[in-house]
Amino acid sequence: MVEKAEKNNTENQKMEELLKIVQQYTEDDFQKIISEKKDFFFLYHLSPMRRNILEWYPFKKDAKVLEIDAECGGVTGCIADKVLQVTSLENNDLQRQINECRNSKKENLRVFTGTYDKMENELERDYDYIVMVGSFAKAPDYFADEKPYHTFIKSAFNHLKDGGEILIACDNRIGMKYWSGCQEELYSDYFIGIQDYIGFDNHKMRNFSKKE
């Protein structure tokens, strides 16, 4: 418990530093900052490579998009550059501030603090796309029933217009990095995703294989 608390404190300190960075510098400076920091935390949150996950996708230019769990906005800017309107949700208010600050010039973007389950009744029901980058695994945090992932998808569909799409990006639980000995990102343990989370109940977060 002490180790976990120390880890959380360290991450909060880095988040506060990240907020100062996006307040004082532009995206043109981020690569230099990443090189100086030599820390995966800053690489993950500041690298323009994060855009690649959706840069290729043919969004309709007049589209409305809901982004669930936007984190610090590493992907948000990419979406906002491609569509008419973006609504982003982020549970952590500090991360929401970072997102708003780094994307402050995006006039088509609104960012709110709150989890999907708490905000769901306030959301519109005519989005063209709903984007879940890393958030689908958190379904058990939002829904306490026996099939939280099914419930999450069904709930999200209620906020799409006819013909709308849900875009999901999450770790492949049997991806090569896990066969190579990397820790499972949700639990910082080894091979549990490859073993299909044996012993876990439906109320634990998990990742999926491509086939799943």
Features from the language model and the residues they span:
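Conserved SAM-binding loop of SAM-dependent methyltransferases across substrates and taxa
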Residues: 72-84
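Short alpha-helix
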Residues: 201-212
